[in-house]
Structure formats: structure tokens, C-alpha cells
């Protein structure tokens, strides 16, 4: 959190004498409670002290807890890793009103998602998600309950099952082909000096992700391409709404951390912006839903919204509105799919450009399997073992989110410690996946590790040393869809083009600060040179 900004907000905002007095009273009460609680970390049994609570980070401020530690500019996952070196793999912190258990040990994480999986099945929401994303109706944030289990069943059996993914394969590949045709056209552009124009692959990955996701969820053809070209005002408006959602949801709000001071959020205007953006997003989703209601699609051409409409009448919604249930589920699929695949593909290619040996190995594997007389197809992907290792290794070093958050409503025991109900769980995935006790040369990019000693480890949430898609009941239901898409795009790109960085320099691997997703902070500009016959880059849409 940018704590200096928070302090400036407090200093620059007029606070009434009544509010200040209430705040001082709260500080006194807080100090009394902290003094009392800090003296009861252990219990005794026949003269022996038995630790009942995990170590607590010292230096908490009244009301704000340890939020001031996030004001140094250091990335949260790195700061938490340093604290783990001091306090151990499990310790507690205070983030405003929230007591949080921070974990970075594979054994403890496994216990949380096996023995205590039901207890840690809730994902904390924020005021931003509440106002903009139907959080109480969404599979992403609705509490663990019969309604959530119904949503999960629909996602895994109706929307993202192997049969459904097979039925939409043609939609997916056709959208990918459209984007590759556009990419080929871009490679033919020259600047005023006749030199090739660099292409921002980060932006292109966003386009192809939008193309595929919007086609399979809403039936919108070439949607990402229309956004880039500005040909469709609805597409441009939608992109603007989603970009604003991403920006607003990355903000730290006092309402989430210190509810007593939540009224200060109104002075910044962010709450009004969230409400406005939520209304605009709901309006466009409702419009698309009405369009789907008025048309009929054959089973072979059904998109996800069609499927949701067809099953909603027979679904137990436990009092939730039918239209909201459909919109919330589709939006969760968008949020879980578009940004995450663009981010993952960007990191994969960035690491390959800085590790040319791995890039050449991947290309040799594809050339040997596919040759140069055709494009890579979906059916080829399962045989690209080195490509699979590259994706795993990238997700180990750069998972979609460095931190994974859950909470519990009931008391439980974790690693011998008593954890009170209401405690949040924060897993430092970044440290977990770079643990030298688990990984050889953990800071190095070595895809070969997944062909040898770590060959049996996958990313599906069953191996707790590698959790890019989460684990437990809340593991991402779209793992198979995401991997199929990423394999195809990456394989076609490596197979179809020789790639060079500008001036032969390494790619900048700096990470953007803030937000919920681990985003590369700079563009990925490369010079692409086609290496196949021109006819192979053409496509029929």
C-alpha cells in the first residue's frame, strides 16, 4: 500500500473535532487491547510453555497495524519474504482491522488446503469488487455455501469441461488465426528509414486474449481486433470500462482496511468512480444478455452466455437473481481469463528472449514435430514437452499473482498454532515457488527442471510447491482452457517468427507495483521476421 499517500490524505482532509476525538478514543482502546493480547501468546502446562499462536510482527501502529511497512516502495511479496526470514514461515500481521496469517512454507500451505480446506474456502472481497463486479453473486467472491458449490459445478461441468472445450476449439483457433494474420501484416510495415517497425507483443497478447475470451463467452467475433483498430464503438467503450475496472480495483481503500475512516474515501472521488463504472459495465452486460435472449443458437455454436441461459431455469439459485447470476458468472470468466493469459504470455516470451538457448530448443522441438509446411495445431500441443516445461518454469518465477489471499470464519489449527475465526490467510506464492529447500537454483530460469527431477509437478493445484492457479476449493476452474490457449499461441509465435529485441538488449523484467496481478511494467517491443511460407499466415475468418 502507498502509505505516504494515505497519510497525505489524512493531513489534507478536514477532520471535525468530534471525529478527531473519536479517533483518539479508538487509539486508546486499541492500545489497551494490544497490550492485553500481546501478553497471552503462550499457555503453560506443568511448567512447560506451549506456543498457541504464531509469531506476530512487532511495530504495529494503532488502528493501521503494519500498513506503514508497505510505504517504502518495496514490493509487498519481497517485504513479506524478508519478514519470513526473521519470523519464520508462518507469522501474523495487522492490516488495518484484519489480522492476517502470512505463510510461505509448502507443508503449511498443504495443511491449509487439505486438512483446513473448507475453513479457508472464502476469498476476501473489497469495496471495489463489491461495487463493480457483482461480488456477492460471483463465483470469485461469494462465500463458500450451497450457492457457491452450484456455481462451481456449472463452471467445471458445463462451461469448462473437456467436452465443452472441445466443442469451442474451432472458435478459439479461428480467433487466434485472425490475430496471427494481423501480426503478419504488421511485420511488413517499415519506418521512414526502411527498417522494420517494432511490435509491442504485450499489447498484441492482450488483443488475442480479448479475441478468444469474448468469442467463447459472448460470441463477439474479432472483438479484440476491433478494440485495437477502433472500428467498433461498443468494443472501444467496453475496453475503456474494463481498463477503469482494473485501475480502480488496484486502489487501496480505507473502507477495506480501517472502516471507521472509510468516509474519507468519498473525498477522493474513487467510490463515485467505482459506482459509475459498475453501472456502465452492468449496462453493457445486460444489453448483451438481452441480445442472447432474443436469439437461438445451435448447440455447436453456443457461447458461454447461451449455455448459462439454457441451464439457468433448472439451476438452484438460492434467492439470487437469474440475470445477475448469468452476468456475474460471465464477468468472472472474463476477469479470470483475459488479463491473466496476456500477463502469462508476456512473461514467457520475455524470459525466452533473455534465455535464447531455451528459445532455440523450443523452436527445434516444434520444427521437428510440425515441420515448415503447416501451422501448429491444437493436436500438436500435447507433444511439445519442452514447451510445457517452459510454461511451468515461467509460472514458477512469475505466477499470475505473487500473493494468494483467503480467510476463515471459524477457529482452526494451522501448523500447531491456534488461528482465530476471521483471520485472513496470505500465501506468499513468490517466496514459496523460489524456496531453495524445494527448488535447485531457485532464482534461475531452467525449464529442464520440469523434464527431470520436477517432471511430475503440474500447475493444477495438487502440488503445493507450484501454485500459479491457486489450490483447494477455490483453485481456478479455467486451468485447462488457459493452458490450451497459451500453448497454441506461444507455439505458433515461436514457430512462425524469428524474434529480436531492440538493439540486441535484454528485455526489462521489472514488475509493475500495485494491483492484484503480476504485470510487466514496460512494453515488450520486438522485431519479428516471418520464417514460414507467406500462405501459412493467411486465414479464413
UniProtKB/Swiss-Prot annotation:
Bilayer-spanning residue ranges: 9-29
UniProt KW Transmembrane helix keyword: yes
Name of one Pfam family that matches: p450
Family: Belongs to the cytochrome P450 family.
Protein's name according to its UniProt entry: Protopine 6-monooxygenase
CDD domains, alphabetized: CYP82
Record's GO cellular component terms: endoplasmic reticulum membrane
SUPFAM superfamilies cross-referenced by the UniProt entry: Cytochrome P450
Coiled-coil stretches noted in the UniProt entry, renumbered to this chain: none
Reactions accelerated catalytically: protopine + reduced [NADPH--hemoprotein reductase] + O2 = 6-hydroxyprotopine + oxidized [NADPH--hemoprotein reductase] + H2O + H(+)
Species per Swiss-Prot/TrEMBL record: Papaver somniferum
Compartment(s) where it occurs, according to its Swiss-Prot or TrEMBL record: Endoplasmic reticulum membrane
Cited InterPro entries: Cyt_P450, Cyt_P450_CS, Cyt_P450_E_grp-I, Cyt_P450_sf, Plant_Cytochrome_P450_Monoox
Disulfide bond sites: none
